[in-house]
A protein has these predicted regions:
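Bacterial N-terminal signal peptides that target proteins for export
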Residues: 1-10
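Cleavable N-terminal signal peptides
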Residues: 10-12, 22
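Short, low-complexity N-terminal intrinsically disordered segments enriched in polar/charged residues
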Residues: 23-75
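A solvent-exposed, acidic/Ser-Thr-rich amphipathic alpha-helical stretch
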Residues: 59-132
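Short beta-strand edge/turn micro-motifs at domain boundaries
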Residues: 137-145, 154-187
Length: 188
């Protein structure tokens, strides 16, 4: 019977090692999300909403759609496996959008498959601010509950309650996998 020490010595002679002492070529991948990552993702989402509105004002539907496609591809995880997206102003039977096309239609309208979509991002938004109520970070996922205040060019403010859940994709980018939004309850 060979002892553990004898086996280790034999493996060492052969150029092999056992246990935790082997540290050559150690690879550590840390995809942990930080609070700052979440806050930056929310700022970017708000900025993109305003930018799509501006693109619509200056370049029409075509410009807004082109920008919205880029935003969806960079912010959401449709290409990385899927998204649960429940936008603010949707109605049955198309309340939840699990496809990129459904999200695009919600933001800019114009898709006959979604005839009730008017283009939420085309409403003349001039500012957007996410105020966090809570953030939970669990390594490679993070969830936030926020009040998002969106102002249009007339100065009217719409407040929505948002839940965003993020993952880190294979390229190390933060992506939205859950986006639930509803109008703030006013008690009336």
């Amino acid at each position: 019977m060979i002892s553990r020490r004898g086996l280790a010595m034999g493996l060492a002679v052969c150029g092999l090692a056992i246990g935790s002492s082997a540290q050559a070529n150690e690879l550590l991948i840390d995809r942990s999300i930080t609070k700052n990552d979440v806050l930056e993702a929310q700022r970017a989402w708000c900025a993109a909403l305003v930018d799509i509105s501006k693109a619509y004002e200056t370049g029409g539907q075509t410009a807004a759609k082109a920008l919205a496609e880029k935003v969806i591809d960079s912010a959401y995880a449709y290409k990385a496996g899927g998204v649960l997206f429940k936008p603010t102003l949707t109605v049955n039977p198309q309340t939840v959008r699990t496809s990129r096309e459904g999200a695009l239609s919600y933001f800019v309208g114009g898709d006959p498959e979604y005839p009730n979509d008017k283009g939420f991002a085309l409403r003349g938004w001039t500012s957007c601010l996410a105020e966090d109520n809570a953030i939970i970070i669990l390594g490679e996922t993070a969830t936030s509950l926020s009040k998002v205040r969106i102002t249009n060019k007339d100065g009217s403010v719409v407040t929505v309650d948002k839940t965003w859940q993020y993952i880190v994709d294979q390229e190390g980018r933060l992506r939205i996998v859950v986006h639930h939004s509803s109008l703030e309850h006013t008690g009336e």
